[in-house]
Amino acid sequence: MRFLIRLVPEDKDRAFKVPYNHQYYLQGLIYNAIKSSNPKLATYLHEVKGPKLFTYSLFMAEKREHPKGLPYFLGYKKGFFYFSTCVPEIAEALVNGLLMNPEVRLWDERFYLHEIKVLREPKKFNGSTFVTLSPIAVTVVRKGKSYDVPPMEKEFYSIIKDDLQDKYVMAYGDKPPSEFEMEVLIAKPKRFRIKPGIYQTAWHLVFRAYGNDDLLKVGYEVGFGEKNSLGFGMVKVEGNKTTKEAEEQEKITFNSREELKTGV
C-alpha cells in the first residue's frame, strides 16, 4: 500500500524551511503516529532487528527555492511525502495515528494534515524503469569500518538482490525467487547526516529492473537497499499513473539526465 501524505503549513502566507537532513524527523513522525494508534506494533517495529517492511520518501514541497550556502530549502504552499508498506497493519496504524493527531511538528515548523491519498500501484514490474523518491543505501564493513558501496561496484547489485530476497521471505514466508537484474541508467550521490556524527552516502538512481514480479514488487513496496525505515530506497515506476508532485520531484532530483551515467 502506498500513500501520499500532504501537509499544510501553519502560516500559509510564508515559506517554510525544510532541512536537507530531515529523514530522522520523518521517522519520528511515522513512529509517533503508529504508537498513538497501535502501541504494541510501534514497540515491535522499534525492537525488531532487520527490515521493518516500510519506507518513505524525502519531504517535498509544491514549490521550493534553494538559497545558496544554507542547510535547508524553502517550501511554499503545501508540503508532502510518500509512505509505502506491504503490511496492512502498519498502513492502518499510520493512517489512524495521523488522523488522531492532525497537528504535525517537524524540525522547527508546524503543519496540519491536509489529506492522505491512497495511490494506485503498477500492475507490472519486470522490465520497468524505476526512479528513486529517496536515495538507495548499500553498506558493508571493510577492514573494520563501514563502507558505503556505490553502484559502480558489482557488490552493490548482489547486496540489493540478497536484501530483496530476505524481505521477500519476511513478506511472503516462501522461498524467494532468484531472477533479478538491475541496470543503472543514471546515478547521483547524496550524503546525508542520519544522526549527529553518523553519515550515509546514498544514491538517487534511474534504473531498469528485470526478474520475478513479486520480488520486484517487494522492492517497490518496502524499498530497495538498506535503511528503508530511515527514509532510504523508495522508488516510483516511470510511466505509471502518478501524481504531479512525484513528477516534479524527479525533475528536481535529476536536473540533467547526463549528470552521471553508470552501468555494471
Curated annotation (Swiss-Prot):
Keyword Lyase: no
Cofactor remark: Does not require a metal cofactor.
Keywords: Antiviral defense, Endonuclease, Hydrolase, Nuclease, RNA-binding
GO molecular function, one term: RNA binding
Record site feature (Transition state stabilizer), residues: 52
TM region(s), chain numbering: none
EC number(s) recorded for this UniProt protein: 3.1.-.-
Thermal dependence, as annotated: Optimum temperature is 70 degrees Celsius.
Highest taxon of source: Archaea
Residues the record marks as active site: 31, 46
PANTHER family in the cross-refs: CRISPR-ASSOCIATED ENDORIBONUCLEASE CAS6 1
Similarity-based family: Belongs to the CRISPR-associated protein Cas6/Cse3/CasE family.
NCBIfam families: cas_cas6 (TIGR01877)
Function statement: CRISPR (clustered regularly interspaced short palindromic repeat), is an adaptive immune system that provides protection against mobile genetic elements (viruses, transposable elements and conjugative plasmids). CRISPR clusters contain sequences complementary to antecedent mobile elements and target invading nucleic acids. CRISPR clusters are transcribed and processed into CRISPR RNA (crRNA), also called psiRNA (prokaryotic silencing) in this organism. This protein processes pre-crRNA into individual crRNA units, with an 8-nt 5'-repeat DNA tag that may help other proteins recognize the crRNA.
Protein's name according to its UniProt entry: CRISPR-associated endoribonuclease Cas6
Protein species of origin: Pyrococcus furiosus (strain ATCC 43587 / DSM 3638 / JCM 8422 / Vc1)
Organism placement in taxonomy: Archaea, Methanobacteriati, Methanobacteriota, Thermococci, Thermococcales
